[in-house]
């Protein structure tokens, strides 16, 4: 989606010309959930003057009730009209930053926090941090009450075509809606698991790319519903098949120059690229809870399902955490393969960027690339070459996060503490549950 710049007068003009009747002021909470305040277009001037207030105490991880007043400051460049709204008037969306009553950015706003980390990047001489995400999702049928079932929409596989891929019509409509909203769609296809799909859209600067991910999720769920399907970004909804990932392809720029590219080295990579990679590898255990935030996330990060379990990097090999795709020049990038689509994109990207900057600032040395299939190596072989495991549960991921000062810096005290507290409660709740699997295994035997 190309970067656009709008003024207040532009917004007024668009609202009138398009017969906009409602405005959705959108923001994202710490858990990655999209929130919005909907107001009639008669409130447009208050919106443009940053005067729209909401109760922050009602949002997960924001503030206590005695300090709850928050203001929404819209980013005018995020103006878009939802294509599926018409009839009595259209609905327009503006993504907002959250501000406190004293006029300063709220430290618990993930979008504002990402901007803070980007400022740190700029202080090191870089101008842009670009992200190209690869989000995957499943489509399940709805029952007669409109509730999701476990019945898949098809039994297709990787890149399968119709008639096997019965979700093709839904996926096509999603692509059309996204294009109407300004997305530059690069690929759309069936993924490995039945009912699993991937739609890739063009990279963008860090904040815009994260905005696009949140918009993408909303569009996918909305259009799926119109096809009597439920779209889920749950990382591992089914046993025995691949889970859904959201690989992050990232690159640093200095002006128009890709800071990761050097045509005169063996792999075409700069020392900056190696240092950034080293920082990501060093801090990977610490940011795993942010990039894989659900109990369910760790059902995906197991051997045998094309998801990374081990902390290593390679140029071609897809089994490590980090891969360096073969494209060079302006397209030079590193691919962080552990991220799943349940992650808050603003927080995940802030953590990965801070980890990479840690490598650059401290001139960390990257280990040797691993070009063999790590899944086929035993523990002794992995340990011999210094390959660590990613955390295998949310509990161990939170433990690693508590021990990592770089990730604490990436998120800031407020988000860091609120996230750990919320996720610790989630883990404790899960830990005390009794599952159907346990009853099936033990009820009769004991």
From Swiss-Prot:
Activity regulation information from UniProt: Inhibited by glutamine.
List of residues binding Mg(2+) 1: 134, 247, 335
Annotated site (Important for inhibition by glutamine): 64
Reactions catalysed, as given in the entry: L-glutamate + NH4(+) + ATP = L-glutamine + ADP + phosphate + H(+)
Compartment list: Cytoplasm
Cofactor: Mg(2+)
Enzyme class: ligase
Pfam families in alphabetical order: Gln-synt_C, Gln-synt_N
Predominant location: cytoplasm
Residue intervals of the GS catalytic domain: 110-446
Alphabetical keyword list: ATP-binding, Cytoplasm, Ligase, Magnesium, Metal-binding, Nucleotide-binding
EC number: 6.3.1.2
Gene Ontology terms: biological process: glutamine biosynthetic process
Gene Ontology CC annotations of this record: cytoplasm
Similarity annotation: Belongs to the glutamine synthetase family.
Entry function: Glutamine synthetase (GS) is an unusual multitasking protein that functions as an enzyme, a transcription coregulator, and a chaperone in ammonium assimilation and in the regulation of genes involved in nitrogen metabolism. It catalyzes the ATP-dependent biosynthesis of glutamine from glutamate and ammonia. Feedback-inhibited GlnA also interacts with and regulates the activity of the transcriptional regulator TnrA. During nitrogen limitation, TnrA is in its DNA-binding active state and turns on the transcription of genes required for nitrogen assimilation.
Protein name: Glutamine synthetase
Organism: Staphylococcus aureus (strain MW2)
